[in-house]
Amino acid sequence: MSDNDDIEVDSDADSPRFHGVADKRAHHNALERKRRDHIKDSFHSLRDSVPALQGEKQSIKQASRAQILDKATEYIQYMRRKNHTHQQDIDDLKRQNALLEQQVRALEKVKGTTQLQANYSSSDSSLYTNPKGQAVSAFDGGSDSSSGSEPEEQRTRKKHRPEDS
């Protein structure tokens, strides 16, 4: 018997069954490490997204996961309230806009009818004014003979008196 024969070592590491278990365990450990790293990265990302915690990565005492979740929850609730307020403001502005558009349409309608009336009355008045813009009687025929700009004395005839000589 040799020295090697006396020491028989049951080595499970050499058996195919152990390689399968060891590989499974190593694979499981790698997956678990990857999962924990992903969770850790997600918490860091969440921490960096919350304004109240943005300076925490440089501070001596970092926020715990529970603190990160609490602050994130508070921030989400705050943003929901703010979003709701903004939505109400948007709805109010839409109502105001609709009201103003309705008023504009009403004013344009009034303006249109006023312009039509002005055009109609200006066309009517052109029948009763001479080219100088002076009022003319409908029975006058449009002559300039009696313009309002002449003094009263010039419009009336002066009587000629023969002098006694």
Swiss-Prot record:
Residues 1-38, 47-66, 119-165 are annotated as: Disordered. Residues 23-79 form the bHLH domain. Keywords: Activator, DNA-binding, Nucleus, Phosphoprotein, Repressor, Transcription, Transcription regulation. Residues 14-38 have a biased composition (Basic and acidic residues). InterPro entries: bHLH_dom, HLH_DNA-bd_sf. Residues 156-165 have a biased composition (Basic residues). Residues 56-65, 119-132 have a biased composition (Polar residues). GO terms for molecular function: DNA binding; DNA-binding transcription factor activity; protein dimerization activity. Residues 1-13 have a biased composition (Acidic residues). Phosphorylated. Residues 86-107 are annotated as: Leucine-zipper. GO terms for cellular component: MLL1 complex; RNA polymerase II transcription regulator complex; SMAD protein complex. CDD domains: bHLHzip_Max. Residues 140-149 have a biased composition (Low complexity). Its main location: nucleus. High levels are seen in the kidney, gills and uterus. It is also found in the brain and heart. It is found in: Nucleus. GO terms for biological process: determination of ventral identity; dorsal/ventral pattern formation; hemopoiesis; positive regulation of transcription by RNA polymerase II. The keyword DNA-binding applies. Efficient DNA binding requires dimerization with another bHLH protein. Binds DNA as a heterodimer with MYC or MAD. Component of some MLL1/MLL complex. Transcription regulator. Forms a sequence-specific DNA-binding protein complex with MYC or MAD which recognizes the core sequence 5'-CAC[GA]TG-3'. The MYC-MAX complex is a transcriptional activator, whereas the MAD-MAX complex is a repressor. Belongs to the MAX family. This is Protein max. It comes from Danio rerio.
